[in-house]
Amino acid sequence: MFDNKNRFVIENYNKQSCFASFLPGISGIHGTPLWNFYVNRGQAICSFGSENKDHSIMEFYPAHQSYQFTKTMGFRTFLKVDGTFYEPFVDDDMPHKMYIGMNELEIEETNEALGIKVNVLYYTMPNERLGGLVRTVTITNLAGAKKDVEVLDGMPALLPYGIALKDMKETAQTTKAWMQVEDVNEKLPYYRVRIALADAAEVSEVEAGNFMVSVNKNGEKLPIIADPELIFDYDTSLTKPVNFYKTEVLALAAEHQLCANQVPAGFACAHEEITDSHTIYSVYGQAGTKELFHTFANAGLDAAYFARKHEENDAIINELADTIATTTADPVFDAYCKQTYIDNVLRGGYPVKLPGGHIFYVYSRKHGDVERDYNFFSMLPEYYSQGNGNFRDVNQNRRSDIYFANFV
């Protein structure tokens, strides 16, 4: 049931009964949170974004549609292993697993015929001025001989900043005319609308943007394809990467891209000779300005940086959960206690003592997710983040605070 990291394990999750969940979106007091929802289908993440549904990076869908669309519209990985095409997490008969941690999610698939294993790890980037979802894709060579591997990894639809949920649900065809991606050739794609989508006489400039950046272990930025037609060609269902079948991936990335007037994609490209393993590190997020994004992306993103951020991510959630650390004869019950406490923190907040004796509650937000699609949740993209909530949610936690945080 649990692995050696105390993560819950689900074997062959694509064949199990549907369920939906979320990463807690806790990025530390001095971090910027994102909301992230996942289901046990495809590559798991079904939607994510900043603040609320009107700031989606991957479009928000309610649960029943997430179960249908995640294999296609969620994250995708296309591989050519010694010339043989393979898309992991699509064939339900291929052995695969899901590992669910308190503040991370990992999926794994093993292809014995090709002699490779693919692991994808997700966690929210902690302690940064901008919010980001970290996605690391590791391809492990299970055979003795070196393998030639081409990789195309990312999202078939990455929404530009400035598009509300209503725009995508009601007028998406019209809204495409505002969409654009900048700086693709610099390997720093910045997704935003040209001008604000407002029926007003005054034109408003949009500074903020959604972004992605992908690097290898040495911190070298990878080429990005933002034009979905360059990958899928005539296949408008986005099922088959038609051009990837017949074109070497780096040559494909070097071709001309149409970066406006369509829903853009976001795929990183790599071509490697793999003896042991190879990892692609990607961050998908939102920044208040392009300058802030460039400062972040050029600050030494390499394997050591992501290892450090992963450790910080674990430390943040464990510090909260240790408040209710329980030791019994049943480790499942002990883990349940920690998870229950984290769930309560998310609903009613975690008390922090400020100078002057003031108490401030961080991390609270209304319990909206893909199943509770009626709730308009909000998580402010700022330090000491908190969100909207119901009075009953706050009161629920105040009863337990007198025991777990007696300074209140």
Where are these regions (language model features)?
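Anionic coordination/interaction segments
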Residues: M1-V408
